[in-house]
From Swiss-Prot:
Residues 478-767 form the Protein kinase domain. Disulfide bonds join 55-101, 178-230, 277-341. GO terms for cellular component: cytoplasmic vesicle; cytosol; extracellular region; glutamatergic synapse; membrane; nucleus; plasma membrane; postsynapse. Residues 25-119, 158-246, 255-357 form the Ig-like C2-type domain. Pfam families: I-set, ig, PK_Tyr_Ser-Thr. It is found in: Cell membrane; Nucleus; Cytoplasm, Cytosol; Cytoplasmic vesicle. Keywords: ATP-binding, Cell membrane, Chromosomal rearrangement, Craniosynostosis, Cytoplasm, Cytoplasmic vesicle, Disease variant, Disulfide bond, Dwarfism, Glycoprotein, Heparin-binding, Holoprosencephaly, Hypogonadotropic hypogonadism, Immunoglobulin domain, Intellectual disability, Kallmann syndrome, Kinase, Membrane, Nucleotide-binding, Nucleus, Phosphoprotein, Receptor, Repeat, Signal, Transcription, Transcription regulation, Transferase, Transmembrane, Transmembrane helix, Tyrosine-protein kinase, Ubl conjugation. Present in an inactive conformation in the absence of bound ligand. Ligand binding leads to dimerization and activation by sequential autophosphorylation on tyrosine residues. Inhibited by ARQ 069; this compound maintains the kinase in an inactive conformation and inhibits autophosphorylation. Inhibited by PD173074. Residues 160-177 are annotated as: Heparin-binding. This is Fibroblast growth factor receptor 1.
Amino acid sequence: MWSWKCLLFWAVLVTATLCTARPSPTLPEQAQPWGAPVEVESFLVHPGDLLQLRCRLRDDVQSINWLRDGVQLAESNRTRITGEEVEVQDSVPADSGLYACVTSSPSGSDTTYFSVNVSDALPSSEDDDDDDDSSSEEKETDNTKPNRMPVAPYWTSPEKMEKKLHAVPAAKTVKFKCPSSGTPNPTLRWLKNGKEFKPDHRIGGYKVRYATWSIIMDSVVPSDKGNYTCIVENEYGSINHTYQLDVVERSPHRPILQAGLPANKTVALGSNVEFMCKVYSDPQPHIQWLKHIEVNGSKIGPDNLPYVQILKTAGVNTTDKEMEVLHLRNVSFEDAGEYTCLAGNSIGLSHHSAWLTVLEALEERPAVMTSPLYLEIIIYCTGAFLISCMVGSVIVYKMKSGTKKSDFHSQMAVHKLAKSIPLRRQVTVSADSSASMNSGVLLVRPSRLSSSGTPMLAGVSEYELPEDPRWELPRDRLVLGKPLGEGCFGQVVLAEAIGLDKDKPNRVTKVAVKMLKSDATEKDLSDLISEMEMMKMIGKHKNIINLLGACTQDGPLYVIVEYASKGNLREYLQARRPPGLEYCYNPSHNPEEQLSSKDLVSCAYQVARGMEYLASKKCIHRDLAARNVLVTEDNVMKIADFGLARDIHHIDYYKKTTNGRLPVKWMAPEALFDRIYTHQSDVWSFGVLLWEIFTLGGSPYPGVPVEELFKLLKEGHRMDKPSNCTNELYMMMRDCWHAVPSQRPTFKQLVEDLDRIVALTSNQEYLDLSMPLDQYSPSFPDTRSSTCSSGEDSVFSHEPLPEEPCLPRHPAQLANGGLKRR
């Protein structure tokens, strides 16, 4: 009996204890189990802005409770709570914290967390002066706050981590930050290139400031390049972020002087003269202006160095801009002579020289009386000259007429083809005659008229071409559209072709159609046929304009090729220039899209692949330029007009024999001066095309007249590095512009190098939009009077040439140097 009562007593006691220990279901602390990780939504708000937080609700919600840092959130004159939404007017840094929305419903409770940071802090790369003490206090405060919910790590200042790529010069201090939080406080560790990063892995070590979640590396060197990853973790989760560091070595190079400056001057006696010298140097340069003088009747001293007089040298308070200009006032005849701009740094010396010529002021002189005999001689000479010109004109006209006739009647086969097209021309004797006689060369029959009822060519009968079943497309399957462009005798129109794909006979394809204009000649017809046959022989490749078909029967000749909707590469690049960097500023200009460095390298890579394929087919382009590269809707580069190139089977060069108009600014020296064309002359043109790409459609040699280009190229001048171009790509251009053709790279080598560069180039490397306007070359015609480009600017650098005698150095710091011709 007693034992039964004892058992009953203990049962009642245990039941009461369990009921007392059961927590209240309304406590907000139990809204989320302590063992579960929590998702946190981050908000960055600038001081003074409106903060709005909205809670996600279920349909059966019964109550909503808002907390901040675990404390009940109360309404105030700035804080308004309306059920599932909280609004804070004119937010201040004190409003920062972890907000929680706790909802209760019959199905259970749910909590949504918001991390709010009210700050106007700068991004990580610019925020280097943090108050570590305040951060430490904040961290300690976080640790000591009671009743904190378990929270997986989260970023507290993601805006400071937006810049992922950091390119810094050598010897600079680098600081990467990963500001974060969580409950319990997370730990921080760093990886380099995916491996654990310890202080002894780096010369000089590094510092980690856990209070500010940052790593600091002093005096970085090229070996510090790599990917640095911060890992923040606690028992409820882990997050990471990667920074990329690129350390740029300072360029050890002597000063670079802009080509063409100072320039020669010819002035009148008593005038004022200004010489200018542009100097580019990474180490601080020392600039002097010198005048060459004579000593005892000699300009050269016993040491074989010229005698010079120092006219201007840098002082303590003199700026480089002041030193780049030399002013001479009220010049006399004694001021005439040679002047030199000498610039030196710790690496070496550079100099450019110019001549000053002083003339007497022009005076009006009385007209010289001419004798009757002198006048008679002038009249006879003028008459003889005019008669000679008339006779010469008649002879030239006769020769041209004879050439045109023999061109067609005796040599009508198309010279541009490796295999000539069989064309036969019928000459009708009379309208009544049923007989006709054929010309001696096998060509095509004429006599058909175009659909308009008029001859296709003025003065040329329409020719019937042999049908090629592989390429022939019925005319009723081709619908012509708007014109795309035209030349002197040909035009290109947009069209829709039905059934180009034999497997899909009803598919409609947008195409471009080449055709002749009404005033074209027999030569133009043969050229178009030649281009068509050349495209058949070349075959298909992704990076060339491919032949799709032709209409050769029952009407004019239509050559059907691929359509590139975005126009040529030059226009494509110019349309995507950043706003404000056009040469004639247009405030309404909106670029199509922003191009990254990888986009530009990809353009060059695709063109190189197309040229590699043409070279493998023994095809020399002769006119490779951005204007002859077309861009499709999918941004695929396609080389055009290669059908006009020459097919070579037995020799690997082509020597031009006619005097057609040539694009001289893209031509290699051997093509320009000796009229020799090879694959290596195409490589030179590819180097100019590279320069066009990285100047976003700039015009080569801006401000340089064509007549001066020959002299400049012979002297070894080359265009300078574009602003948006790496040193590696510029060296590729310079290799393409090597004076010796055999020393230039092949297209196969260019494809391999560009393929490697594309793989290493980041998609996030956008062009430098802060570059000054004059770093780009103008896209307008090269005239010195252009309002959009400066004729005084030069973009040339100079290849090293044999040394000239050196100047003695007259300040002590230049005592052992000399002048060398660049």
